[in-house]
């Protein structure tokens, strides 16, 4: 629910509230709603959601990626090497101690595993070389290291999915917090879509 911010409210306090609670704060002027304050992460999630929902082809690709994951058409464990044929990024992930598959974890182990839909691998191969490399670096790096912070949440029909822009690619994924598993749904070539032009550094 939106929280009204009157003239006497301290801006820094309101910003802290927005970041801590994810409230959308309505700013009043002359007693009437004049503007809304929300976190940058939420704004970008809304922008991506609107852009994606206006492109039926992209929505269809996301749903096809979801269907592939649910039907078992996916890569996991050692099979994930298919996403990185030259083994420049996946090897670094393994030697860095990050997991690539859901496995029993000791108490206190907060690492995340990864599985990827077959359509996402095909999409990765179709990207320009430098974009594909940057995307692999993200997937086998920051995405596994801090998946919740690495992307922004989508809204509406696309809710419960996260998105991150890397160069001209938009990485769509889900988080399974019970299995601590990142599910890579699809990688979209978005070109001039709104949002940042590189991967997020929140």
What are these model-derived regions, one by one?
Residues 51-55, 100-111, 162-202:
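Enriched for short, Lys/Arg-rich terminal
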Residues 27-31, 135, 139-140:
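Short amphipathic alpha-helical segments
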Residues 83, 137-165:
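A short, surface-exposed loop/turn module that caps and links secondary-structure elements
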Residues 90-139:
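Arg/Lys-rich, positively charged N-terminal/basic patches that mediate binding to nucleic acids
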Residues 1-5, 9, 78, 82-106:
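Non-catalytic interaction/Regulatory regions outside core domains
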Residues 24-63, 89-99, 103, 151-152, ...:
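Short, charge-rich, low-complexity interaction segments located
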